[in-house]
């Protein structure tokens, strides 16, 4: 019997399909995982015991870097965040919530502005102006679908797992279908309809894309930030965090403290006021353990 390492690409009814060196092997999990109350997840890096008789067993789950989403995906390297310009309308507040959540999960984000082609010129110009700030603080921003599709294969590095996120109706499913169809054409695989209904619950799977994977999942249409500690929130606003090293007080929370570098840079226009407003709003929600307004609708 041989052992090999691979990545779980799908899981259904107690079986786990594991990609090992570009081949997919079907496995069963050993009972030891159940005893440990440990459940293998799509995205897990695992050790498989290979049997010439076709009885392959998953025997070890390697340490996870993270676990996000419902259904959960393990070891997500980056998130492609789909934010619409219209239908639904562009929201800086929602954008900041997503960025905060994924910063907390230690996952990088690439921003894609969808529906730019059906957005009135002046409105689109104003949105692009706002997104310029996010590029300045280190986020990659795409406003053109064709440009995104051209660059994505080189952005997804070997064995990385990417997933999509964004508000409902932003166009995640459309983009995901397109990317999966392209990947299937490249590999010669047969694509089946994804059958995404408004309330459809599906199994997560990974499909090969470039030298990594993209998770075929409904993504994250609603997030909550209640588990973040209030005094750690600034760590997930990278622009505020960078400025805070010059604050007079080491644990400055940028509220009423004297000598606050963050508030100084906001007044000078070097930090976007909208970012600070998002910080204060999320901070208040966490403090009060209160549901955000957009989740009440």
From Swiss-Prot:
Swiss-Prot/TrEMBL GO biological process terms: ribosomal small subunit biogenesis
InterPro entries registered for this protein in UniProt: G_CP_dom (IPR030378), NA-bd_OB-fold (IPR012340), P-loop_NTPase (IPR027417), Ribosome_biogen_GTPase_RsgA (IPR004881), RsgA_GTPase_dom (IPR010914), RsgA_N (IPR031944)
Keyword Nucleotide-binding found: yes
GO molecular function: GTP binding; GTPase activity; metal ion binding; rRNA binding
Record's keyword terms, sorted: Cytoplasm, GTP-binding, Hydrolase, Metal-binding, Nucleotide-binding, Ribosome biogenesis, RNA-binding, rRNA-binding, Zinc
NCBIfam families the UniProt entry points to: ribosome small subunit-dependent GTPase A (TIGR00157)
Subunit structure: Monomer. Associates with 30S ribosomal subunit, binds 16S rRNA.
Name listed for the protein in its UniProt record: Small ribosomal subunit biogenesis GTPase RsgA
Organism: Lactobacillus gasseri (strain ATCC 33323 / DSM 20243 / BCRC 14619 / CIP 102991 / JCM 1131 / KCTC 3163 / NCIMB 11718 / NCTC 13722 / AM63)
Lineage of producing organism: Bacteria, Bacillati, Bacillota, Bacilli, Lactobacillales
């Amino acid at each position: 019997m041989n052992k090999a390492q691979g990545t779980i690409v799908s899981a259904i009814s107690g079986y786990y399909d594991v990609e090992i060196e570009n081949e997919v092997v079907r496995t069963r999990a050993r009972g030891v995982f159940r005893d440990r109350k440990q459940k293998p997840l799509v995205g897990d890096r695992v050790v498989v015991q290979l049997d010439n008789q076709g009885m392959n067993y998953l025997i070890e789950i390697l340490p996870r870097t993270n676990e996000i989403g419902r259904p959960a995906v393990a070891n997500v390297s980056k998130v492609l965040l789909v934010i619409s310009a219209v239908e639904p309308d562009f929201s800086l507040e929602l954008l900041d919530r997503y960025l905060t959540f994924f910063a907390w999960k230690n996952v990088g984000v690439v921003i894609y502005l969808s529906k730019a082609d059906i957005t009135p010129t002046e409105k689109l110009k104003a949105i692009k102006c706002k997104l310029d700030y996010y590029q300045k603080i280190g986020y990659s921003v795409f406003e053109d679908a064709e440009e995104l599709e051209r660059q994505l294969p080189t952005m997804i590095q070997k064995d990385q797992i990417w997933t999509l996120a964004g508000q409902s109706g932003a166009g995640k499913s459309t983009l995901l279908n397109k990317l999966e169809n392209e990947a299937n054409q490249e590999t010669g695989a047969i694509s089946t309809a994804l059958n995404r209904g408004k309330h459809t619950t599906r199994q997560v799977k990974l499909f090969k894309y470039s030298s990594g994977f993209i998770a075929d999942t409904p993504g994250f249409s609603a997030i909550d930030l209640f588990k973040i500690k209030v005094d750690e929130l600034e760590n997930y606003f990278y622009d505020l965090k960078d400025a805070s090293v010059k604050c007079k007080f080491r644990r400055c929370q940028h509220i009423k403290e004297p000598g606050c570098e963050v508030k100084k840079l906001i007044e000078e226009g070097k930090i976007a006021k909208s970012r600070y407003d998002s910080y204060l709003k999320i901070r208040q929600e966490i403090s009060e353990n209160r549901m955000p307004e957009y989740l009440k609708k």
